[in-house]
């Protein structure tokens, strides 16, 4: 199930990677396929999942989803399903109650900023803007969570991050890659 973060970031539609990182992660899509075979479900519903799972040296765990395309309402709806299904799959393999999972499981959505300049950025339909996000974060001294995904913070994830590719690299990837050396 282990692969590189680069491989999990591949966008089939546009035939491109969202990161070049060789950091080793669990391919959560492959884990989902294994889970689906195990439960031998007779329903027509296919499970969906986030792209990667990374377990940090400090016991923090990160579910990572890459979105290279435009994030519209249908995409947001699918992100919600991916989170619910991913938690179910995670609980199947890591038998823990939700309270224990919430104490160290985090979620990161990495999106393509260029393709999402004019989209609603929050569930209050404020248009997405990098400068507004930075201003809001510095004034509030906390994370600005876009696309309505703040719903999951403290519900099934400890923290939720919505970051463009550059923010993701600076905020997490550089630190993780140093720890892996």
Please identify what each model-predicted range represents:
Residues 105-172:
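Short, low-complexity, polybasic intrinsically disordered segments
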Residues 48:
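Beta-rich catalytic cores
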Residues 174-181:
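A hydrophobic membrane-anchoring alpha-helix module
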Residues 68-117, 124-125, 138:
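Catalytic cores of nucleic-acid endonucleases
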Residues 1-45, 56:
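Acidic-basic catalytic patches of nuclease active cores, encompassing PD-(D/E)XK
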Residues 52-54, 60-68, 86:
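Conserved catalytic cores of phosphodiester-cleaving nucleases, focusing on short active-site segments
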């Amino acid at each position: 199930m282990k692969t590189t973060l680069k491989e999990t970031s591949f966008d089939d539609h546009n035939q491109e990677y969202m990161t070049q990182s060789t950091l080793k992660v669990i391919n959560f899509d492959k884990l989902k396929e294994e889970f689906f075979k195990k439960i031998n479900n007779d329903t027509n519903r296919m499970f969906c999942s986030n792209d990667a799972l990374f377990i940090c040296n400090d016991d923090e765990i990160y579910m990572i989803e890459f979105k290279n395309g435009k994030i519209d309402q249908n995409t947001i709806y699918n992100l919600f399903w991916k989170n619910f299904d991913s938690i179910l799959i995670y609980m199947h393999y890591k038998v823990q109650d939700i309270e224990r999972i919430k104490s160290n499981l985090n979620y990161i959505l990495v999106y393509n900023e260029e393709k999402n300049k004019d989209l609603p950025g929050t569930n209050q339909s404020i248009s997405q803007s990098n400068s507004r996000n930075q201003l809001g974060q510095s004034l509030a001294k906390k994370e600005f969570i876009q696309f309505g995904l703040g719903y999951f913070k403290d519900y099934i994830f400890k923290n939720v991050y919505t970051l463009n590719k550059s923010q993701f690299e600076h905020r997490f990837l550089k630190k993780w890659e140093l720890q892996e050396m």
